[in-house]
């Protein structure tokens, strides 16, 4: 199976969020299944230098303009990479989507229109001596690719990955006539979205198959609460909408060999947990006691339920718990967390920013992991927590609902704890339930063991994607 995986980012070349991790983990796992997967992304500053293998430059022509592709290998994998080398669009100081100051690049419509054009042409065999059977686009930055292929009988099958529907690629209507897109598609059944241009509709309407990052999220985005105004369209396409849970890098996230831990372990181990708890306490400024540590690692934004942690804080501390939090984000929430740490020295430890080693230590040294996200398409931290024997406390949405089983609802298979509602009181109640089990060590060890025994690698996810590719190719005859 020949697959072109088109993305705006891929770790370690460039990464701003979960899409970068997926692009690396999924393509590597597909290659290990003997899938001929190639990755296309822009050549941002510093990306070419990271390519492995023989690096070659290809030139071609598309719509009267030159196209330059730099070929190499994705570091640490057998995945071929083509970098779209277009310096006026992509060789600039800042991030893939925004300036160093955080403002969206004013020409993002041109930048990712071009990426979509090149993805379509490359997949169709118009640029190089290679053509894809499947074009797998990801998020709004590559979503226009199926538009450029829609009238071609010889086109590849098209699959579109929705990683977070909140990002729809919205642009002012007055840009539409300048982009060379078909005039007849400026309508609600095409690319128009309440008076704006929505790049993401290029794939939501025209891709053969849609896939998102968990079965529950695939259902949720068909509802007004999670659909961002696109729920009607997604419900209309529900027979071609699937959900596959992301995997994690189980070599990097392995408590048995994790170099960031002071004590490694392969199963429930109170002595190793105690050593790792002491390391976390020292790192974030907690007093070293016997009480449970509640961990949090993530963006400090309301989507992640950080305000719920603050609301639940009095009850959590009254239950004898300590909190270890690592993250950055909303200035208001950062300020509130710093104030909580000052008000409760030794009980609340906060590190603003991101530290990879500390993230691993919090997963291994906490007794519970808090993840009360209001919505979470898939989520990774709950998978890290399960693998590290740190039962997660989650609001059951998206991938959290698909991967975390409530202990009290399912005593024989439970591996974590669900909030009954998305509020601070429900979070406190869920933690109190969890701590009642934590006091019973044999029961707690069984909960930990079930989480650690789960399958979280990319191998199973990649097999599901390969099966989906075969289905969509077969459905096109």
UniProtKB/Swiss-Prot annotation:
One GO cellular component, as annotated: cytosol
Positions with a binding annotation for ADP-alpha-D-glucose: 15
Catalyses which reaction(s): [(1->4)-alpha-D-glucosyl](n) + ADP-alpha-D-glucose = [(1->4)-alpha-D-glucosyl](n+1) + ADP + H(+)
The enzyme's E.C. designation: 2.4.1.21
Key words of the record: Glycogen biosynthesis, Glycosyltransferase, Transferase
CDD domains with a match to the protein in the record: GT5_Glycogen_synthase_DULL1-like
Molecular function per GO: alpha-1,4-glucan glucosyltransferase (ADP-glucose donor) activity; alpha-1,4-glucan glucosyltransferase (UDP-glucose donor) activity
InterPro entries: Glyco_trans_1, GS/SS, Starch_synth_cat_dom
One of the Pfam families matching this protein, by short name: Glycos_transf_1
Pathway terms, separated by semicolons: Glycan biosynthesis; glycogen biosynthesis
One BP term from GO: glycogen biosynthetic process
UniProt keyword annotation of Transferase present: yes
Functional note: Synthesizes alpha-1,4-glucan chains using ADP-glucose.
PANTHER family in the cross-refs: ALPHA AMYLASE DOMAIN-CONTAINING PROTEIN, GRANULE-BOUND STARCH SYNTHASE 1, CHLOROPLASTIC/AMYLOPLASTIC
Similarity annotation: Belongs to the glycosyltransferase 1 family. Bacterial/plant glycogen synthase subfamily.
HAMAP family found in the cross-reference section: Glycogen_synth
Stated name of the protein: Glycogen synthase
Species this chain originates from: Halorhodospira halophila (strain DSM 244 / SL1) (Ectothiorhodospira halophila (strain DSM 244 / SL1))
Record gene name: glgA
């Amino acid at each position: 199976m020949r697959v072109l995986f088109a993305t705006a980012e891929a770790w370690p070349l460039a990464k701003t969020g979960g899409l970068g991790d997926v692009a690396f983990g999924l393509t590597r796992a597909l290659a290990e299944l003997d899938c001929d997967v190639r990755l296309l992304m822009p050549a941002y500053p510093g990306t070419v230098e990271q390519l492995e293998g023989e690096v070659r430059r290809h030139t071609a022509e598309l719509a009267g303009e030159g196209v330059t592709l730099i070929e190499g290998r994705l570091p640490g994998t057998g995945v071929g990479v083509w970098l779209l080398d277009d310096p006026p669009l992509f060789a600039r100081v800042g991030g893939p989507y925004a300036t160093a100051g955080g403002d969206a690049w004013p020409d993002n419509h041109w930048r990712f229109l071009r990426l979509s054009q090149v993805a379509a042409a490359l997949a169709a065999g118009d640029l190089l001596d290679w053509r894809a059977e499947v074009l797998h686009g990801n998020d709004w930055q590559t979503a226009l690719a199926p538009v450029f292929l829609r009238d071609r009988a010889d086109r590849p099958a098209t699959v579109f990955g929705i990683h977070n529907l909140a990002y729809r690629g919205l642009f002012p209507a007055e840009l539409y006539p300048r982009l060379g897109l078909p005039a007849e598609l400026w309508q609600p059944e095409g690319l128009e979205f309440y008076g704006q241009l929505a790049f993401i509709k290029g794939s939501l309407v025209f891709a053969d198959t849609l896939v998102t990052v968990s079965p529950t999220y695939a259902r949720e985005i068909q509802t007004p609460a999670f659909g961002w105004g696109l729920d009607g369209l997604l419900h209309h396409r529900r027979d071609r909408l699937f959900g596959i849970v992301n995997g994690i890098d189980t070599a990097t996230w392995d408590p048995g060999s994790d170099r960031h831990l002071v004590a490694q372990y392969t199963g429930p181990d109170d002595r190793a947990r105690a050593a790792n708890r002491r390391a976390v306490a020292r790192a974030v400024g907690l007093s070293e006691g016997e009480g449970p540590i509640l961990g949090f690692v993530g963006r400090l934004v309301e989507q992640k339920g950080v305000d719920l942690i603050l609301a639940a804080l009095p009850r959590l501390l009254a239950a004898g718990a300590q909190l270890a939090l690592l993250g950055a984000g909303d200035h208001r929430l950062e300020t509130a967390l710093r104030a909580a740490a000052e008000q409760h020295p030794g009980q609340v430890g906060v590190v603003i920013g991101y530290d990879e080693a500390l993230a691993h230590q919090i997963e291994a040294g906490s007794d519970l992991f808090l993840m009360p996200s209001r919505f979470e398409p898939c989520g990774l931290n709950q998978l890290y927590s399960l693998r590290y024997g740190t039962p997660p406390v989650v609001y059951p949405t998206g991938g959290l609902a698909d991967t975390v089983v409530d202990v009290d609802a399912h005593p024989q298979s439970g591996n974590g704890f669900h909030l009954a509602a998305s509020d601070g009181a429900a979070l406190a109640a869920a933690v109190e339930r969890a701590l009642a089990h934590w006091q019973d060590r044999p029961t707690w060890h069984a909960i930990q063991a079930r989480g650690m025994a789960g399958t979280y690698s990319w191998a199973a996810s990649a097999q599901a994607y390969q099966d989906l590719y075969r289905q969509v190719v077969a459905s096109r005859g």
